[in-house]
Amino acid sequence: MGKFKFPSAYTILFFLIAVVAVLTWIIPAGQYHMAMNEALGKDVPVAGTYAHVAAHPQGLVSVLMAPIAGLYDPESGQAGAIDVALFILIIGGFLGIVTKTGAIDAGIERVTTRLRGREEWMIPILMALFAAGGTIYGMAEESLPFYTLLVPVMLAARFDPVVAASTVLLGAGIGTLGSTINPFATVIAANAAGIPFTNGIALRVALLVIGWIICVAWVMRYARKVRQDPSLSIVADKQEENRAHFLGNKDAQTLEFTPVRKIILVIFALAFAVMIYGVAVLGWWMAEISAVFLASAIIVGLIARLSEEELTSTFINGARDLLGVALIIGIARGIVVIMDKGMITHTILHSAEGLVSGLSTVAFINVMYWLEVVLSFLVPSSSGLAVLTMPIMAPLADFANVNRDLVVTAYQSASGIVNLVTPTSAVVMGGLAIARVPYVRYLKWVAPLLGILTVVIMVALSLGAVL
């Protein structure tokens, strides 16, 4: 009998869609009354208004339609995750063209030469940059291109794809967990809770700094072990395969870091800088930043003097490389679609509301944290979870004599830690797919770190409740 092989990300997500569909036949359907929140510009649930509604069980057709509905609603035509999927394909084309020019490989050689003997210091520096993106604007889907960039860098430095993936995922993730001015988490949640988002910022900064130190130490410890003994890598059996995929025959010759390649890397960096500025300052999202990378791909192709045929075929091949990631994003969003159409999202939320009433301050805030953890698995969108839960959960804090800002911190900490591992997150599944790191292996590797971070969060929340 053959050895059991864990299913792919696609199978896991389809299985979760089926499980949630079954739950729509078991969990009673219900809904809160929704009212417009002028500050948010969205309808939000009103506490105390939950009522049962007619059941909307989801069947086989709904399960099969879920990945499609995850990309766009076939009934209304409203976009779902299709903008993110298209962004991924355009990023793939852009990276394909940049890679074709040899600029990335030449740049990698220059970086590794300059950092020879101290490559591990890339880890804290890069994790600090990603954490800044997380805490400032909730860096998520836009972090996916960095996986493709960093894996070859880390492999050339004698690390493994896990080091590259965790540098991005844990870096941006701990930043989001300790969000300070993140408009998609802290600001939305605080507005929904009826408080200024600056309330409680000191505790969030403390969580951010402590969490970053812990994550950096975890990744650097693993990186040193792998560098000293590659057999200790959790993907050691894929070492040659990964080197062939990400580095190709790079070792066969030294690429000259020509002025043209330098210009291409400058454009490469500027594209990401413009993306970050546009999202954080100008309010851009997927359509605008997709256009940035499309324009950048054309500019790079012209500078590299690629022919029209070379440019278009290279772009298409690059997009093809990330097609699987784009599909994962649609499937992951399909889980939430089934929950919403089955009318069980608010029922689960109502059960959570009943559990937190009448508790002590410390018990309340920790129960709140764990409830948000459970809900975060079902609603991986931080802004969606904020709009869904804060209007109901924050008023409950008044009865427990807990400051509302602490509820906001509990929410974003729970959402942040879950989104480091949840299989419903396109960032987790997509990032690991790009780095070719099996999800279950990553989960086992990161589990002790999650335990440490959870203890830190619960201690911080408890201190915040009693001080």
For each predicted feature, which ranges?
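Long, contiguous bundles of hydrophobic transmembrane helices that form the permeation core
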Residues: 1-6, 10, 34-43, 202-314, ...
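C-terminal transmembrane helix pair
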Residues: 7, 356-467
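Membrane-core helix-loop-helix motifs of multi-pass transport proteins
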Residues: 2-12, 147-237, 254-258, 262, ...
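Hydrophobic core segments of alpha-helical transmembrane domains in multi-pass membrane transport
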Residues: 10-28, 88-96, 129-133, 175, ...
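Alpha-helical transmembrane segments of multi-pass membrane proteins
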Residues: 85-88, 119-134, 159-177, 209, ...
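Membrane-interfacial loop-to-helix junctions in multi-pass transporters
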Residues: 75-85, 113-125, 157-163, 262, ...
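Core transmembrane alpha-helical segments of multi-pass membrane transporters/permeases
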Residues: 9-10, 14-18, 43-106, 284-347
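Hydrophobic alpha-helical transmembrane segments of multi-pass integral membrane proteins
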Residues: 88-90, 118-149, 329-339, 355-395, ...
